Amino acid sequence: MIELFMKQKMFSFKDAFHIYDRDEQETFKVEGRFFSLGDSLQMTDSSGKTLVSIEQKLMSLLPRYEISIGGKTVCEVTKKVTFSKPKFVISGLNWEIDGDLWRDEFQLTDGENVRMSVSKKWLSWGDSYHLQIAYEEDVLICTAIAIVLDMVLYNDEDESIF
């Protein structure tokens, strides 16, 4: 089980997240671009090498984001139309989101196995979240999906769930 802590940078003109390991060492940094049409973020390692790209697809009625690792599209995350709690489709992976997104407690599953659990850390400066990722090979994609969910649900309200 890989444990990461995700903190959204406060007071920034662009989207920015810092991801730390259990020893409080920064593992990844995620930053958006200034003046881009739609959201466009890059996840980098400690040396500044881009590992993941997150691009909002603007030619869509509903929020839709493409996640690429190493230049290859891995999945798309699209918000579905609902009248109650938010729902998302994660195409390309056949994964599902279970739990309560509004209460900041949910799991990402592949139908049988939990791939990631997310919970909000209360009483912290800014928005901080605890990510528990079951498989090492899922660290990048799970972290990117958590960031996309935050952007879709709370970007317009200047709030965050991750």
Swiss-Prot record:
InterPro entries: LOR, LOR_sf, Tubby-like_C. Pfam families: LOR (PF04525). Belongs to the LOR family. This is Uncharacterized protein YxjI. The gene is yxjI.
